[in-house]
């Protein structure tokens, strides 16, 4: 399975990158391919472009604030292939987030 994700927290420091690490670790454990864009204190890193979103089976937005380019995910949202969660939930229990995401497929 191919997943794209964006992480962003209110301050853009710790939780943004902790959520990224949790998503990548859980994805690897399950044998999934994931690309995680971070929108934090360093700006946008590892940007997910429209082609990446279109090619993905599903998208996860682990965000606590508005993000740049959220319209990239409109089609995933409309087709029910988008999971939006709080970054702290990803950090606390990434397994549960992936279980929830798998139900969208």
Q: Can you say where each PLM-predicted feature lies in the sequence?
A:
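Short, solvent-exposed amphipathic alpha-helical segments in soluble enzyme
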Residues: 19-24, 76-78, 99-100
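Ser/Thr/Gly-rich flexible loops in soluble cytosolic domains mediating phosphotransfer, phosphorylation
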Residues: 4, 78-105
């Amino acid at each position: 399975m191919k997943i794209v994700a964006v992480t962003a927290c209110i301050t853009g420091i710790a939780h943004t990158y902790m959520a990224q690490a949790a998503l990548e670790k859980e994805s690897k454990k399950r044998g999934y391919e994931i690309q995680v864009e971070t929108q934090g204190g360093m700006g946008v890193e590892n940007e997910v472009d429209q082609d990446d979103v279109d090619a993905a089976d599903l998208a996860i937005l682990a965000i606590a604030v508005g993000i740049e380019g959220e319209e990239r995910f409109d089609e995933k949202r409309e087709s029910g292939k988008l999971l939006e969660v709080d970054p702290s939930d990803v950090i606390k229990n990434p397994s549960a987030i992936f279980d929830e995401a798998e139900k969208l497929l």
